[in-house]
Amino acid sequence: MKKDREPIDEDEMRITSTGRMTNYVNYGAKILGDEDKKSIKIKATGNAIGKAVTLAEIIKRRFKGLHQITRCGSTVITDQYVSGQDNSEHVVQEKTVSFIEILLSREQLDMKDAGYQPPLDEKYVKEMTPEEIVNSRPFRRGGFRPRFYRGFRGGRGGFLRRGGYRGFGDRVYEPRSSFRGGRGSGYGGNFGRGGYRSGGGMGGGFRGGFRGGFRGGRDGGYRGGNRGGSRSGFRGGRGGFRGGRALS
């Protein structure tokens, strides 16, 4: 069921969590670029509040002398829809959500208002036309790109040779290997490619030093060293440590 939408003024912007910031900045710049428009009002609810605050800060840094008044609180939103197989049941639901209203104006606003903010210092403002704002570097590629997807990599160190740890490289996620020990960070005589490696499957589990230490079998469990296990406790690699005699 469609519900009647409240009329929106020409100088008003209603921000949604799915809207593109580029479009909002472009529209806001066009409003303030008009000589007849002295103010702009930005409204948002719920998850879109953060985007509305970001939009206001961008506009304030592109137009000089903008006074600001911010109001926030909670409001009740009513959703109406029909249910049932024959769409005969009329359902009304009410929910309380947070909202924010940001008024930016070239004219002086009430300085006694609790949400009043004076214009930014001109040294922090770089005036641009609407076209220059959209074509500027932060917006040419549709916003910023975070770098967390590159994972992390430990430096040299760890245990003897090239220890440390490695993240999941340049891939977002690789289910076969979550993290991998660096070289030489496990038990074993020669300290070859040791460390530990997570993940199941064949050859998974823990992998110790150079053919020694702990090594996970195909079905999990432990397999000691080269020929360890039930015959001789557990046995490390070359130069590692060796358990006692087999139990009779």
UniProtKB/Swiss-Prot annotation:
Pfam family, one: Alba
Localization terms from the record: Nucleus; Chromosome, Telomere; Cytoplasm
Coiled coil spans: none
Residue ranges, annotated region (Disordered): 217-248
Any one GO cellular component localisation term in the record: nucleus
Biased composition (Gly residues): 222-248
GO BP annotations listed: regulation of translation
Gene Ontology molecular functions: DNA binding; RNA binding
UniProt xrefs under InterPro entries: Alba-like_dom_sf (IPR036882), Alba-like_NAB (IPR051958), DNA/RNA-bd_Alba-like (IPR002775)
Keywords: Chromosome, Cytoplasm, DNA-binding, Nucleus, RNA-binding, Telomere, Translation regulation
UniProt keyword Phosphoprotein present: no
Family annotation (SUPFAM superfamilies): AlbA-like (SSF82704)
Chief subcellular location: nucleus
Disruption phenotype: Attempts to knock out the gene were unsuccessful, indicating that disruption is deleterious to parasite intra-erythrocytic growth.
Record carries keyword ATP-binding: no
Family designation: Belongs to the histone-like Alba family.
Assembly mode: May form homodimers. Identified in a TARE6-associated complex consisting of over 30 proteins and including ALBA1, ALBA2 and ALBA4; the complex binds to the non-coding subtelomeric repeat region TARE6.
Function: Possesses DNA- and RNA-binding activities. During the asexual blood stages binds to a sub-population of mature mRNAs and regulates the timing of their translation. Binds to DNA with relaxed sequence specificity. Associates with the subtelomeric TARE6 repeats.
Protein name per UniProt: DNA/RNA-binding protein ALBA1
Organism of provenance: Plasmodium falciparum (isolate 3D7)
